[in-house]
């Protein structure tokens, strides 16, 4: 990537960052490309960038990022579980309206912040149990952590109402 002084406009730098990173970029990505924090703020105010969450941005015009991509960028500690995992493994033909995500108990603020972007049902898990059965899988072209089949079935019995 080129720096601002190399005759690139701020808009060109932003477009290069999104070409390199994807549909959602962090403020640090723009800063390492040569923009200043106040430039990012000004681009948001002009309507060129849109703030997804503190420190995360997307282009204001264009396609909305996939829910899977938003989850992978903004909920780095979330694991797909229960209804969403059942659908992923083909145990259910019912596509859930909201993502079932397991998070450590200390991440309640993170979940509340992301619920404005993606419908999420959070399952708060104790830290010793959180990583048991964790694996990864492709969701619509994006790799997300998901609990394995055995953990999914056990969690369904645990959380049934």
Segments (PLM) and residue ranges:
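A short, conserved structural fragment
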Residues: 47-54
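Helix-start/capping segments and mature chain N-termini
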Residues: 1, 20-21, 33-34, 148
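Short amphipathic alpha-helical interaction segments
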Residues: 31-45
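A detector for short, charged/polar N-terminal pre-domain segments
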Residues: 2-20
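Nucleic-acid-binding surface
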Residues: 9-13, 24-29, 44, 56-161
């Amino acid at each position: 990537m080129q720096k601002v002084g190399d005759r690139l406009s701020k808009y060109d730098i932003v477009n290069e960052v999104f070409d390199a990173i994807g549909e959602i970029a962090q403020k640090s990505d723009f800063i390492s490309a040569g923009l200043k924090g106040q430039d990012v703020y000004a681009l948001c105010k002009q309507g060129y960038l849109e703030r997804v969450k503190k420190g995360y941005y997307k282009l204001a015009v264009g396609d909305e990022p996939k829910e899977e991509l938003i989850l992978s960028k903004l909920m780095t500690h979330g694991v797909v579980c229960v209804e969403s995992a059942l659908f992923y493994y083909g145990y259910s033909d019912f596509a859930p309206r909201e993502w079932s995500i397991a998070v450590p108990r200390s991440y309640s603020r993170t979940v509340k912040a992301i619920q404005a972007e993606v419908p999420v049902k959070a399952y708060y898990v104790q830290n010793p149990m959180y990583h048991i059965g964790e694996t990864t899988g492709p969701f619509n072209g994006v790799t997300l952590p998901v609990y394995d089949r055995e953990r999914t079935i056990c969690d369904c019995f645990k959380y049934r109402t």
